[in-house]
A protein has these predicted regions:
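Alpha/beta-hydrolase-fold catalytic nucleophile elbow
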Residues: 119-120, 169
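Short, glycine-/aromatic-enriched active-site segment of Class I SAM-dependent methyltransferases
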Residues: 121-145, 154-155
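Residues lining the SAM
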Residues: 90-93, 119
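A short glycine-rich, Lys/Arg-flanked "PGG" loop and its adjoining helix->strand segment in the class I
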Residues: 100-115
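Conserved catalytic loop of SAM-dependent methyltransferase domains
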Residues: 165-201, 224-225
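A SAM-dependent methyltransferase catalytic signature shared across enzymes that methylate proteins
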Residues: 150-167
Length: 233
């Protein structure tokens, strides 16, 4: 499941790209399919990084082999000033107590006119989850805030970024999380949850055109994520 549209980023050979909070590497694998990039991924989870390294090593269609994944704190990034052409931060800020410090760090390491892409859960879809289930927002390491569209945009532009595009993604995933909140987040045996998950996995693997068209239609209405495309300076 990819949240960031890489074709929007105009990446070129020798561009240096960071996925800040890379998790299991979903965006790193997409970046590796772009020829000639220098790719970095950081996360706080050693287990996730281990899985990411394995998946990157075994990619049969990788066009960029110059990559490094390592453990690091997004509030204290181990990189020099102005060292990246692009930074991706997808579904991370909602987990971080000091999210403003994280933004300052990403601003610091970006080159002038560099690209920042930030995605977070969309207010409407997330608010429903919080309303249905206390466990959803009380889970350790989970989401600690909900962003409104204007609120986050103003925070990003207040840091000096220029926002040139906003879009929405993963509309078909919103009902899945509402269902999980209704039946219990850890209840994987519920009939509806089990088969909806299989449907989503099938969609991710097969990408059937009618389902892709349906989600594109629904994204502005009930997209699970909101994505901000920004330029530094």
């Amino acid at each position: 499941m990819v949240t960031v549209d890489l074709h929007e980023l105009n990446l070129k050979p020798n561009d240096v790209v960071l996925d800040a909070g890379c998790g299991l590497g979903r965006h790193l694998r997409q970046l590796a399919r772009v020829p000639g990039l220098k790719i970095f991924g950081i996360d706080k989870s050693t287990g996730a990084l281990r899985e990411t390294s394995k998946s990157m090593e075994t990619m049969p269609d990788a066009q960029s082999k110059d990559y490094l994944v390592s453990i690091a704190d997004i509030n204290k990034l181990p990189f020099a000033d102005a060292s990246f052409d692009c930074v991706i931060c997808s579904e991370v800020l909602e987990h971080i107590p000091d999210h403003k410090k994280a933004l300052k760090e990403m601003d610091r390491i970006l080159k002038p006119q560099g690209t920042l892409v930030v995605s977070v859960p969309r207010y409407f879809a997330e608010r429903i989850c919080w309303f249905i289930s206390r466990d959803y927002y009380n889970e350790e390491g989970g989401h600690i805030r909900i962003y409104k569209k204007k609120q986050l945009r103003e925070m990003l532009t207040g840091q000096g970024f220029q926002c040139w595009k906003i879009n929405y993604k993963h509309a078909l995933h919103s009902p899945y999380w509402w269902l999980k909140c209704l039946v219990g987040l850890k209840n994987e045996e519920n009939f509806l949850v089990k088969y909806y998950k299989k449907f989503l996995e099938w969609d991710i693997m097969k990408k059937p055109r009618p389902v892709r068209m349906l989600e594109e239609f629904l994204n502005p209405i009930m997209g699970k994520s909101i994505v901000y495309y920004l330029r530094k300076g």
